[in-house]
């Protein structure tokens, strides 16, 4: 995926699209496996909905951290300790 400061080119966008397609295929296989194991579709839909909400919140948080980092003249990762964030999350 494109990182801060990385130049956006058609090649990097195509690479990101391919990675996302591969991730979608992997997730579709996992869903099929869970259904085969007896999980109900409604449970999976609720779980997926919660994951989307989590990812949206995380995306907004990263954007805000980025803006704060620019304001303070530091990198985003340098802000992680200030907010007790794990850099591996």
From Swiss-Prot:
Which segments of the protein form a coiled coil according to its record? Answer: 7-37
Cysteine pairings via disulfide bonds: none
Q: Which UniProt keywords apply?
A: Coiled coil, DNA damage, DNA repair, Nucleus
UniProt entry tagged with the keyword Transmembrane: no
Compartments where located: Nucleus
For this chain's UniProt record, which GO biological process terms are given?
A: cellular response to ionizing radiation; double-strand break repair via homologous recombination
- Enumerate the InterPro entries for this protein: DNA-repair_Swi5
Name the Gene3D superfamilies for this protein.
Answer: 1.20.5.170
Q: Which GO terms describe its cellular component?
A: nucleus; Swi5-Sfr1 complex
Chief place of localization: nucleus
Give the UniProt family note: Belongs to the SWI5/SAE3 family.
Say what the protein does: Component of the SWI5-SFR1 complex, a complex required for double-strand break repair via homologous recombination.
UniProt subunit comment:
Component of the SWI5-SFR1 complex. Interacts with RAD51.
Q: What is this protein called?
A: DNA repair protein SWI5 homolog
């Amino acid at each position: 995926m494109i990182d801060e400061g990385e130049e956006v080119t058609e090649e990097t966008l195509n690479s990101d699209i391919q990675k996302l397609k591969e991730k979608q295929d992997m997730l579709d296989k996992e869903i099929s496996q869970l259904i085969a194991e007896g999980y109900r579709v409604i449970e999976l839909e609720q779980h997926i909905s919660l994951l989307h909400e989590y990812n949206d919140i995380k995306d907004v948080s990263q954007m805000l951290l980025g803006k704060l980092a620019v304001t303070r003249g530091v990198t985003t990762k340098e802000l992680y300790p200030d907010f007790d964030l794990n850099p591996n999350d």
